[in-house]
Amino acid sequence: MSHGPSPRLAESPQLSKGSLLTILGSPSPERMGPADSLPPTPPSGTPSPGPPPALPLPPAPALLADGDWESREELRLRELEEARARAAQMEKTMRRWSDCTANWREKWSKVRAERNRAREEVRQLRQRLDALTKELAGARRERQEAQGECEARGRELARLRGARGVADQTRDGPEPEAEREPVRDVGSERPPGSQELELVESLLKSMPEESEDCWEARSLGAGGPRGSSGRQERSRLPWEDTAATEEEASKLTALRLRLDESQKVLLKEREDKLALSRNIEKLEGELSQWKIKYEELSKTKQEMLKQLSILKEAHQDELGRMSEDLEDELGARSSMDRKMAELRGEMERLQAENAAEWGRRERLETEKLGLERENKKLRAQVGDLEEALARRRRQTASALDCDLRASQAALFEKNKELADLKHVHGKLKKQFQEKVAELAHANRRVEQHEAEVKKLRLRVEELKKELAQAEDELDEAHNQARKLQRSLDEQTEQSENLQVQLEHLQSRLRRQQQNAPLFGKIRSARFGTEEAEDGTSDLDEDEDLQIQVA
């Protein structure tokens, strides 16, 4: 619907007198009614000297419309300034929100970097622990190998001693003779091989002297009063002497063979003894090396325990810092919740203001409709005035000019008022459009704020989930550290048990080394008593000396 003026009213100020007369000359019968309300004119053709009749004035709301519109414009401008201030405040709050989110991101990046650092340290500790466990396993294997070698050496020693005892028993079995006296440890400073050789040589030297003494004693005992019997015996003596010399020669050859065998056995036993001494020295060197390695392992273990304690302290410090950061974040989260509540209140207030703006808009529309109705009334009044002027022009030709001028002036004023009203209406329309655009912009901003608030809520939930994951990972790291500590304690206990076993083996080896000469002495004493009871020869002393050497 167009609200512009009608062309008849728009062109009314430019109408000439003739046109007005023609218009007034042909009045319509429908508009003749209101002429009765006009004052009567004089019957003569001359106009009355009095003032022209008063024209009907517009209603009071039309006169007071300008003041109302100015006050309304001031109110609208004030509301516009308030809306702009609110929009600036909202922008400031959104900037603060963006700064808060940036700070949160920085804090979470720091927390993630610290978490990655802690994971890297835990991984390095695991690698070091694996390397230490491998070294401990290698040390255990080497220790077990050393124990196996020690046991094998012990078995070899026992086997050699058993073989030597069996050889001694086999040597002692076929000989019927026994020693006269048990051999004692005389001249222990000399080597046992030289003592045995000297004993065998003395035995060989004493045997021919004894045979010569026996021969002289026999020859002296034969010279008696019985000469005939002596002569008979002299014929027997060469045969007996030859038999005795043959027996003694066979005994000497047997003794020499036994001497050679005993020398060979002594050489073999010396070589075995040297090899055993070398093996024992080698084992002692290996034991010293194992002791050094064990000390190094204990030192490395102490260092690892120190490092673990340092890492535990650092981890506890980091946990304290992380708990403080979490408390700060909880405080920031509570402040963010408060800000969210404030923003919600502000959004509700903006929604209420938006509703009020919509109410104002409806009121403006109603006022606009009222103005349009007033315009229609004014147009109707203008039409009535024109009809009244036409009737008066028809009634009084003399007062036509005055009435025409007055009506033209009134029409001009009315047109002027209508133009002012149109101008004000255009301004109000522009302001209304601006308000509508601002309201649409405010609605878009509110929707953007709501979307950003939703994004922030989602981000807060994601941060909560990441925080829970970080706490779970920290708990897993604690559990793994406890497991590693438990495994380290078990390994230390196993290493202590192995050390105790190694000390027991060393003490057993020392006892065996100390008991070896005592065992030889006991053997020699036992064999000496048995030979003294049997009355054996000096050849068994050689065997006792061999047993003592063993």
Curated annotation (Swiss-Prot):
Top-level taxon in the UniProt lineage: Eukaryota
Ribonucleoprotein found in the keyword field: no
Biased composition (Acidic residues): 530-550
Pro residues bias spans: 37-61
Sequence ranges of Basic and acidic residues compositional bias: 138-159, 169-188
GO CC annotations on file: myosin complex
Keywords from the named record: Coiled coil, Phosphoprotein
Coiled-coil parts of chain: 72-161, 263-396, 427-518
Protein's recorded name: Coiled-coil domain-containing protein 102A
Lineage of origin: Eukaryota, Metazoa, Chordata, Craniata, Vertebrata
